[in-house]
């Protein structure tokens, strides 16, 4: 099997293509690298100015080496092989959006560090139970959630009580699976 592209190589390609230093860029796109990126290595820490980092459509298994990305607001990791959310601590104080659809995440342990997270795009993962889902209650400003395609959502959508159960659990939520949440006045008063 061929060796994957390193972050350092990907950043070099990006700089060549964009005629800009990655370390000075607010948005860095390292998606769909050929061969794919397999590891989030220490070279990421050079992206101190970066506000939006895209690493989607690669073969990354673990979230790592985000220390140094003090300004990161949007992290895109969709379509990888990520199994858990460990490794987000370094961006806990800045990250506002996490795009992590089409991975293999079953457990939401580690998400609680994202105190500024407003948007979580997490469709097509493997979350199966409410115990895991309810860890999202630890995100005080979460307003938009996409969770379609997880076993938990599929089961409860089929039973017809998905939106109801989610809005009872996540009271600040404004949008679920692309649909605005309309609350009636009685719910607003609790």
Swiss-Prot record:
Gene Ontology biological process terms, A to Z: outer dynein arm assembly
Keywords from the named record: Cell projection, Cytoplasm, Cytoskeleton, Dynein, Leucine-rich repeat, Microtubule, Motor protein, Repeat
One cellular component term from this protein's GO annotations in UniProt: cell projection
Entry-linked Pfam families: LRR_4 (PF12799)
A molecular function GO annotation: alpha-tubulin binding
Compartment(s) of residence: Cytoplasm, Cytoskeleton, Cilium axoneme
LRR repeat copies, ranges: 49-70, 71-92, 94-115, 116-137
Residues in LRRCT domain copies: 150-190
Domain of life: Eukaryota
Entries under SMART domains matching the protein: LRR_SD22 (SM00365)
Primary subcellular site in the record, as a coarse category: cytoplasm
PANTHER family: DYNEIN AXONEMAL LIGHT CHAIN 1, NISCHARIN RELATED
UniProt name for this protein: Dynein axonemal light chain 1
Species of the source: Ciona intestinalis
